[in-house]
Amino acid sequence: MAPNDTISDMLTRIRNACAVRHPTTQVPTTKMTRSIAQVLKEEGFIEGFEETGEGVQKYLVLTLKYKDKNRQPIINMLKRVSKPGLRVYSNCKDLPRVLGGIGIAIVSTSKGIMTDREARRQNVGGEILCYIW
């Protein structure tokens, strides 16, 4: 059965894989999950991702990133903000700073999916999808 909220599903799969220190995790491919994975890669939260599968069953295989030999995950917390039942929007002036700029907020804007810093730089607001730190 396909999940209704693909973003929450993606964040949960990443959170669970980090908790048990798996090197990779699979998430179903959508335009949104691909864009979020690209932002995570650009910000250094994951090492990379690749698309696998064919036809209807396509997946993104995310390669997770860990610190030092103790394999502490780079991603400490993933928090979904805007949900299907309660959307959260913000203009560019009111975009939140996550942990004083240490973390990021992923924002869906009219110019695509980007971080809160990039949205402020481009002077656009949008839907706050999630916080990551």
Swiss-Prot record:
Entry similarity comment: Belongs to the universal ribosomal protein uS8 family.
Primary gene name: rpsH
NCBIfam families from the UniProt entry: PRK00136.1
GO molecular function, one term: structural constituent of ribosome
Function: One of the primary rRNA binding proteins, it binds directly to 16S rRNA central domain where it helps coordinate assembly of the platform of the 30S subunit.
PANTHER family reported for this sequence: 40S RIBOSOMAL PROTEIN S15A
Annotated source species: Rippkaea orientalis (strain PCC 8801 / RF-1)
Any one of the GO BP annotations: translation
Keyword DNA-binding in annotation: no
Keyword annotations of the record: Ribonucleoprotein, Ribosomal protein, RNA-binding, rRNA-binding
Keyword NAD: no
Known partners and oligomeric status: Part of the 30S ribosomal subunit. Contacts proteins S5 and S12.
Protein name in UniProt: Small ribosomal subunit protein uS8
GO cellular component, one term: ribonucleoprotein complex
Organism ancestry: Bacteria, Bacillati, Cyanobacteriota, Cyanophyceae, Oscillatoriophycideae
Source taxon at top rank: Bacteria
